[in-house]
């Protein structure tokens, strides 16, 4: 029977000093025999997805204590990618993922905590905490802050989100008054941005991995139903502790739950719902932390057989996360995958003995449980607020239309090709990724002339100055994990291409990455990156590039001999941008770049460089 990790600091005469300090935090004699459960919160007033989390850690703490545990809360950092976007602040976004993972490890191991409740929400916070959970391999449960309500305005017939505000701002035909109206309406409440962007994608994937409760990814941040997720998480983590430490049941550990098959389930969900390409980066990183042999080739294999069963903004304007919830949430998509014979349903979760059991209970098309149906009727109130659980609006009906609704059956899929694809070719030998859910079918095969930019900043200037023409393939390089450093998101370039009417007339390829809000023929994560000697660094203005999504290929139309000659020349010059970039790279960013791998490895640290230390 495994001992509580916390015994290291709570038991024995020699630990009198440590116990004295524990007592100073409020612990009593009887508490030293209970599991100490860390609550990793991520409250900050910088991020709308986290602004409402301040008191939620203590909400969970009280529930843990009622269930027989001791709760100790700490906080991690959280970067808002939307606010950091378009300037050097974005250099810090992806590196913050590693900082968050390390912070959770530091706090949990330094204080010998027995289990963790991860209160996450936005883009790098959920991945960072997931990496830490799999690294530590002690009982864990995830509960996120929830998605934002979609914005509403009389100037648009559809719900609004952050991307709408960005696109309209760059549209020279839009009046200042219209831009101001979109700005004020796009992000009305607390919560993670309302589309299937990176934050919501990752929170949905924690359900598929089996590490979060049903509804975690789709229940609105403002809705009263979300409070029950936090309370249930508090009770559940104590039960997981009892099963592991009291019954020697290691099936409750994160590496037992989030195994190879679970990663396949998560990736199949991602492909089926057209999630953010960033999820690929984060799943690969989490798999490495959990020592799961899941890589880009597995994602490529799955992308060829999973259809697109759900379409949400930014891939379609009609639906946002509140609509996914009304259609039954993630377990309804998982149910469709299961009935299609793709999902691994024999896996345990933190809340059910198997995924099959969970689907039977939570898929609205499979259950007659009125409580479940009521749960998925939770909807938006349309009242601007920064307060969690502040409304209890419900839809009158569910969206259980699997032929024409938000979530589809296999027979009525949006497309038989899934929403994400991996492309290989001489310009990206180790692969690159594209969100096919956001690409118009008319440009699934696209040949164009390369238009080279050595940074995101110069690309933005070029697009706004009309230097990019229809038929161009915009190449933005030296923006990978090492080259940026930090692998910036390219939401502004793609948004500006849209505003210039080039969304279906151009492509964009980068060794950087894209926001979950990106759509269009936007191909990222080109590996190896330019700074690591990748062929994207050998492309020249005017070179022909052929993109062929159906055949999963992307190739520079240049001979092998010419590429070899260019490589010799570039080796002499050094793999760095051809222009000086006015970019302040701090010591912290240099340290990140020193160990960073390319995107095909999840942009994690190169552990080989640390061997022997």
Swiss-Prot record:
UniProt catalytic activity: (2R)-2,3-dihydroxy-3-methylbutanoate = 3-methyl-2-oxobutanoate + H2O; (2R,3R)-2,3-dihydroxy-3-methylpentanoate = (S)-3-methyl-2-oxopentanoate + H2O
Cofactor: [2Fe-2S] cluster; Mg(2+)
Signal peptide extent: none
Biological processes, Gene Ontology terms: isoleucine biosynthetic process; L-valine biosynthetic process
Cofactor annotation comment: Binds 1 [2Fe-2S] cluster per subunit. This cluster acts as a Lewis acid cofactor.
Sequence similarity: Belongs to the IlvD/Edd family.
NCBIfam families: ilvD, PRK12448.1
Name of protein: Dihydroxy-acid dehydratase
Originating organism: Pseudomonas putida (strain W619)
């Amino acid at each position: 029977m495994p001992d509580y990790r916390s015994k290291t600091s709570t038991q024995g005469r020699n630990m009198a000093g440590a116990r004295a300090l524990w007592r100073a935090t409020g612990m009593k004699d009887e508490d030293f025999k209970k599991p100490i459960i860390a609550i990793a919160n991520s409250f900050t007033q910088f991020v709308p997805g986290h602004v409402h989390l301040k008191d939620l850690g203590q909400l969970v703490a009280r529930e843990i204590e009622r269930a027989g545990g001791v709760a100790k809360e700490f906080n991690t950092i959280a970067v808002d990618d939307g606010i950091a976007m378009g300037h050097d602040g974005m250099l810090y976004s992806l590196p913050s993922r590693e900082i968050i993972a390390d912070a959770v490890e530091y706090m949990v191991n330094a204080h010998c905590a027995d289990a963790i409740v991860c209160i996450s929400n936005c883009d790098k916070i959920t991945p960072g905490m997931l990496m830490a959970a799999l690294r530590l391999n002690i009982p864990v449960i995830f509960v996120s802050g929830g998605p934002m309500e979609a914005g509403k305005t009389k100037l648009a017939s559809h719900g609004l989100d952050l991307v709408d505000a960005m696109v309209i701002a760059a549209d020279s035909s839009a009046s200042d008054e219209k831009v101001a109206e979109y700005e004020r309406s796009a992000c009305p409440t607390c919560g993670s941005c309302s589309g299937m962007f990176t934050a919501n994608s990752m929170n949905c994937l924690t359900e598929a991995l089996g590490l979060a409760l049903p509804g975690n990814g789709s229940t609105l941040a403002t809705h009263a139903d979300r409070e029950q997720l936090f309370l249930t998480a508090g009770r559940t983590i104590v039960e997981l502790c009892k099963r592991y430490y009291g019954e020697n049941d290691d099936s409750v550990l994160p590496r037992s739950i989030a195994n190879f098959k679970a990663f396949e389930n998560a990736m199949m969900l991602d492909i089926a719902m057209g999630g953010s390409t960033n999820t690929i980066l984060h799943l690969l990183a989490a798999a490495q932390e959990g020592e799961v042999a899941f890589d880009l080739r597995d994602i490529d294999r799955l992308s060829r057989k999973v259809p697109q069963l759900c379409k949400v903004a930014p891939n379609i304007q009609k639906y946002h996360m509140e609509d996914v919830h009304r259609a039954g949430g993630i377990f309804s998509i998982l149910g469709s995958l299961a009935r299609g014979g793709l999902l691994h349903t024999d896996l345990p979760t933190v809340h059910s003995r198997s995924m099959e059991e969970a689907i039977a209970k939570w898929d609205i098309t499979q259950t007659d449980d009125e409580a479940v149906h009521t749960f998925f009727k939770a909807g938006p109130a349309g009242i601007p607020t920064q307060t969690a659980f502040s409304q209890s609006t419900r839809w009158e009906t569910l969206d259980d239309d699997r032929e024409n609704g938000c979530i589809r059956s296999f027979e009525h899929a949006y497309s038989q090709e899934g929403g994400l694809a991996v492309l290989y070719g001489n310009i990206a030998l180790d692969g690159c990724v594209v969100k096919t859910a956001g690409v118009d079918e008319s440009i699934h095969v696209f040949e164009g002339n390369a238009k080279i930019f050595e940074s995101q900043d110069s690309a933005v200037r070029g697009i706004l100055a009309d230097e990019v023409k229809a038929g161009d393939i915009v190449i933005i390089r030296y923006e990978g994990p090492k080259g940026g450093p930090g692998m910036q998101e390219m939401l502004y370039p793609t948004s500006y291409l849209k505003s210039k009417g080039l969304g279906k007339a151009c492509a964009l390829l980068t060794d950087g990455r894209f926001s979950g809000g990106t759509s269009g023929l936007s191909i990222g994560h080109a590996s190896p990156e330019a700074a690591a000697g990748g062929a994207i660094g050998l492309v020249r203005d005017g070179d022909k590039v052929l993109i062929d999504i159906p055949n999963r290929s992307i190739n520079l139309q240049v001979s092998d001999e010419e590429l070899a000659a260019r490589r010799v020349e570039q080796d002499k010059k050094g793999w760095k941008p051809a222009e000086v970039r006015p970019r302040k790279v701090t010591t912290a960013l240099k340290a990140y770049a020193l160990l960073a791998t390319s995107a095909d490895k999840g942009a994690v640290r190169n552990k080989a460089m640390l061997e022997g230390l």
